[in-house]
């Protein structure tokens, strides 16, 4: 049995703590705030409740695997349901696309928008099939060997082709390019700096669908917190980690204000920049910055919108309608990116979605406030070209017995990838 200290009680830290405890390790989890879950939480005011971060996820198998390997299966703990639509897109030329999750549905919807668009989009998505299969085996689902990458992986990681450049060659319709780049723009990345192979996100959306928890995504964190208690994890809330203690070049403890907590293995599931011993290892990276967020409580008649609507342009606006509200009321969240020179609800009204008269409550959150609340950006490391994939830590680090998980670790941000990061660390450490 090894003593493992996990730094960070967001989804990544909770997932890796549960996995390691189930395999027999003595696990202590440190969380700086009073609550677990991090960005996988909720905001509640005046009877309204909104998802604080993600409102849906990809790759449901990641959650199912986590729950199956740490105790009761997912289906016995919470509802995880598929969504019929990936999202609705409203383009600057006043055309609208409700994008289904299935390949056949996407073909039909795009051909209805303009004949021939469906086949072009299908060919684009299909082109990432091999990327996913190669990287799934050697990067996403198993700890990668940085010094001995298989040739198919090395070719992708060394490629200078960025997503923007590939799309200019393969997708001549501006609306299709906006479909392909939206997931990255929404998380603060410039497609000119995102490797082309990361376009596989469109493949994952189509192949595996988008899924949500009807009661709110925070339920995942609540159930995981109970799972930690079941597995005997010692959870220290309100206990920020100040640094990882190194002795003879290896990690031996985590420093807190109350003293050092000895460890045989340390897992850092927060932004490494916040820990002096790790900061030099990530000095070539930058965090991706959260959007401007406005949670609104509405009353009366409002437009009937799907769970997510993307309003293309500058600023880029995203409307999420799946919050919980009392009868006769509605809970929406609006994200804004780009040139935001006016109130988000006023900007929304310019797209003919005017709910200012229905507003009864609002919660505004700036990028700075979000980072301060969570201690770091939940969007992880900013893509700065092909070097980013190697500059990001995880599951190992150059320091023996020190590992990283979470949004700032391999393989990246987003609920499914953070879940995979936890599985990678658990596999690397192994059973007790």
Predicted features, each with a name:
Residues 25-27, 266, 357:
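Hydrophobic anchor at the start of a short beta-strand
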Residues 54, 407-430:
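A conserved FAD-binding loop/helix module that cradles the flavin
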Residues 242-329:
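Mid-domain catalytic core of redox enzymes
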């Amino acid at each position: 049995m090894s003593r493992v200290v996990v730094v960070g009680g967001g989804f990544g830290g909770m997932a890796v703590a549960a996995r390691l405890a189930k395999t027999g390790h003595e696990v202590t989890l440190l969380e700086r705030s009073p609550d677990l879950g991090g960005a996988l939480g909720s905001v509640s005011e005046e009877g309204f409740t909104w998802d604080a971060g993600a409102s849906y996820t990809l790759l449901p198998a990641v959650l199912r695997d986590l729950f199956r390997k740490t105790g009761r299966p997912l289906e016995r703990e919470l509802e995880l349901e598929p969504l019929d639509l990936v999202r609705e897109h409203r383009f600057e030329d006043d055309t609208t696309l409700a994008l289904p999750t299935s390949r056949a549905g996407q073909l039909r919807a795009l051909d209805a928008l303009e004949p021939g668009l469906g086949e072009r989009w299908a060919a684009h998505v299909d082109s990432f099939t091999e990327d996913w299969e190669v990287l799934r085996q050697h990067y996403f689902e198993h700890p990668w060997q940085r010094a001995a990458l298989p040739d198919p992986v090395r070719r992708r990681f060394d490629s200078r082709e960025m997503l923007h450049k590939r799309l200019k060659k393969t997708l001549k319709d501006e609306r299709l390019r906006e479909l392909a780049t939206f997931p990255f723009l929404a998380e603060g990345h410039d497609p000119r700096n995102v490797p082309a192979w990361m376009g596989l996100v469109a493949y994952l959306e189509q192949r595996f669908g988008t899924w949500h928890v009807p009661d709110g995504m925070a339920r995942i964190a609540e159930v995981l917190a109970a799972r930690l208690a079941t597995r005997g994890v010692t959870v220290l809330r309100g206990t920020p980690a100040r640094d990882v203690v190194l002795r003879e070049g290896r990690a031996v403890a985590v420093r807190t204000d109350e003293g050092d907590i000895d460890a045989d293995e340390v897992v850092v599931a927060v932004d490494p920049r916040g820990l002096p011993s790790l900061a030099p290892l990530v000095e070539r990276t930058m965090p991706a910055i959260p959007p401007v967020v406005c949670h609104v409580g509405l009353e009366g008649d409002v437009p009937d919108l799907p769970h997510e609507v993307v309003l293309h342009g500058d600023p880029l606006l995203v409307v999420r309608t799946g919050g919980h509200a009392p009868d006769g009321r509605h809970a929406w969240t609006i994200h804004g990116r780009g040139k935001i020179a006016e109130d988000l609800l006023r900007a929304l009204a310019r797209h003919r979605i005017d709910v200012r008269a229905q507003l009864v409550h609002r919660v505004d959150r700036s990028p700075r406030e979000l980072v301060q609340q969570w201690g770091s950006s939940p969007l992880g490391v900013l893509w700065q070209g092909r070097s980013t994939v190697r500059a990001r830590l995880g599951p190992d680090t150059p320091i023996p017995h020190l590992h990283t998980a979470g949004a700032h670790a391999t393989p990246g941000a987003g609920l499914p990838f953070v879940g995979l990061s936890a599985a990678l660390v658990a596999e690397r450490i192994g059973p007790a």
